[in-house]
Amino acid sequence: MRGRRFFYSRFLVSKDINLWDMKRYWLFKSDVEDYPLSQFIKDKKTAWEGVRNYQARNFMMKDMQVGDEGIFYHSNAQPSAAVATLEVSALATPDKLQFEKKSDYYDEKATQEKPRWYCVNVCYLQSLKVPISLEAIRSEKDLQSMQLLQKGNRLSILPLTEKEYKKLLKLGGL
């Protein structure tokens, strides 16, 4: 008898696979002016706050686990580029900025009892030896299906396949 199947992000997975035991990989985008790599290195660990897209929020709430790894990517930089690696260090908790009236990320519909926005903690692992520009990513045949390259994709957090993650590490000199 055939097992039921379901879609997890972009991946077809059998019901017999325990997704919680699988390490996942992510691309975390940050505007270079909002949170530069130099600040991430100094902080060593940060709450990934300010995500205001439901799909990206759901990745953090439902899919990310402690130990998942990712690429820190500077958007709106000259050039935009993958610059470091990181690791998810704590599960999703309510994003405190949604409750702060003076914050750019304040959400008047969010309450302590029913928060709308969540964030995970991530810790800095290491800088790539060679930043990987968006142009370099586009030119790699093995990375053509990356969600980062899909037209209209503006999410601040994107899933990566293990193959994409390892290719980015290689391109970055790690």
Question: What are the roles of these predicted feature ranges?
Answer:
Residues F7-L12, L19:
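Short hydrophobic targeting helices and cationic amphipathic motifs
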Residues N18-V66, E164-Y165, G173-L174:
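Compositionally biased, charged N-terminal/linker segments
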Residues Y73-P79:
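Short, charged beta-turn/beta-strand-edge "cap" motif at the junction between a beta-strand
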Residues A84-K151, L155:
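Aromatic- and Lys/Arg-enriched surface recognition patch
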